[in-house]
Amino acid sequence: MARTTPIARYRNIGISAHIDAGKTTTTERILFYTGVNHKIGEVHDGAATMDWMEQEQERGITITSAATTAFWSGMAKQYEPHRINIIDTPGHVDFTIEVERSMRVLDGAVMVYCAVGGVQPQSETVWRQANKYKVPRIAFVNKMDRMGANFLKVVGQIKTRLGANPVPLQLAIGAEEGFTGVVDLVKMKAINWNDADQGVTFEYEDIPADMQDLADEWHQNLIESAAEASEELMEKYLGGEELTEEEIKKALRQRVLNNEIILVTCGSAFKNKGVQAMLDAVIDYLPSPVDVPAINGILDDGKDTPAERHASDEEPFSALAFKIATDPFVGNLTFFRVYSGVVNSGDTILNSVKSARERFGRIVQMHANKREEIKEVRAGDIAAAIGLKDVTTGDTLCNPDHPIILERMEFPEPVISIAVEPKTKADQEKMGLALGRLAKEDPSFRVWTDEESNQTIIAGMGELHLDIIVDRMKREFNVEANVGKPQVAYREAIRSKVTDIEGKHAKQSGGRGQYGHVVIDMYPLEPGSNPKGYEFINDIKGGVIPGEYIPAVDKGIQEQLKSGPLAGYPVVDIGIRLHFGSYHDVDSSELAFKLAASIAFKEGFKKAKPVLLEPIMKVEVETPEENTGDVIGDLSRRRGMLRGQESEVTGVKIHAEVPLSEMFGYATQLRSLTKGRASYTMEFLKYDDAPNNVAQAVIEARGK
């Protein structure tokens, strides 16, 4: 089968935003205008196409990033058909992992902001993730029809809060109820969409006389930004020559692809205005798979040779699995992005991360929760495979004759855990199966059995995250569970270096004995300096410990890290240097050295000024002005550190850092303090030393 759409006409984009910026409605309109959807789905009545899990429809928030394929030939049918693969990403902080996953496989992104609320805390998180993966982006300022809408204020916030370089591509004509259309600053024309056909058709008109001066000023700003793309254009501009529309677009595109500017569009998805022009901007300014750098990887050749794969059908097949979803009808769906080559249904592929071969059964292209079966996928495609057995998020799928491991994704550690137990004996077995499936889908969700209490513990990124997991167990797997009180994921660390700590395990009891002897130094690592939070240096000279026992020493210490000496929490940011020891020709064994290492570790840890670390959350509260004092007082009582406040149209925004352990039940308290008028967001910021009294209470409660 030949390629139907040239790869240069592909756009793999994410639509990303703060909760309530109207992202799902925006995606719905995209699907409507691209001719996929014939009746517009509204989020308000739970009918939106992209929100396909029941919990999403009930809660009106997007949880799973569904991937959808659509085609667009331009608002005025001015292009050849372009294939747009859209990944819808959630806007709630507890689902940041979903955003991280989708950013990894996107080529470009549309950031949706609310014209009233502007740049919110979650917008900043998403922005950092887009920066990390160097994703070129444009912005769409939505809800221009709402009370308090102010386009240029949001443009200012993109500059000040995100440190970006926003360049408006349009201006809003009117605002709130008077919002009627936009000024196209490239063409210098007003665009008015036709309400009668839900904005499918439009007219170019003259710019309203009272906006001409403002439009001229921002047109000039746009031209200057374009001219900065090259010396040649700058000379032309400074020489007083007009830049052509084609030159302007080409120059702006180049600057967006280089992540130098963010083009800003606006509209009201709900009122069917602006989304159409934003789609044109996706085609004009966001990259195709051939415009972004080749993906890096390492060859599976035992030497970890660096390699790259270009977006071409001619190169060997390589793809990244970025999401696993359980579908009630077909079982496991593995969403993957093809970076190079071609694969057909029925082909055998290699999961190079697990060194396992899999057979591609059926391949489907998703449109929200409808699916279309296809025979092959090519470089640049995003699709889902049915029936892959052992694939986890972040695995590489590739041609078995040309194995490569693409860059792995990094997933955050959970910060909150709860105990769950099945309500009945019948639920017991089903619960294990359900939790296993859900953990496979979501790498930021963990499940384990607590060795002391024998309880099943689930851990995730926040209370809402775990609520939804428990909810899904009930709905999708019919498992009823009792849920315990949330527990904080503390950590343990050391604050000083200790040297020459000895650990000796020697047993002589008739026949062969056991003998292992190690001497180690232990030192703190700078938080975040080592992704594993642990380093092991083998500094043994002259074979005082034979090489075959060194891994056992490392393993013995790593086992101790899982449950620290203070209160049984994981130990982080610690370095070990093994530099001396001794062995016995007959009595030494791996087990003996493992035990010697664990003895040395416990001994050293006690002397190295151990501390308990607690997760600190970044909290932002928006409250009416008259409640500011109460809200700040309450945050202080929760050991919160105030980091500033600012006035907003709707009241006051308070920034604080608060320990997670003090934030349980905060939503209820905030509601009663402000009669339900305040809202807050919270996301993990860092681990910090817990004060003595808090640490003591935690240690005593753990019975250590």
Swiss-Prot record:
PANTHER family xrefs: RIBOSOME-RELEASING FACTOR 2, MITOCHONDRIAL, TRANSLATION ELONGATION FACTOR G-RELATED
Keyword Membrane annotated: no
Organism (species): Cronobacter sakazakii (strain ATCC BAA-894)
Family: Belongs to the TRAFAC class translation factor GTPase superfamily. Classic translation factor GTPase family. EF-G/EF-2 subfamily.
Record bears the keyword Heme: no
The protein's role, per its UniProt record: Catalyzes the GTP-dependent ribosomal translocation step during translation elongation. During this step, the ribosome changes from the pre-translocational (PRE) to the post-translocational (POST) state as the newly formed A-site-bound peptidyl-tRNA and P-site-bound deacylated tRNA move to the P and E sites, respectively. Catalyzes the coordinated movement of the two tRNA molecules, the mRNA and conformational changes in the ribosome.
Sample GO molecular function, one term: GTPase activity
Protein's recorded name: Elongation factor G
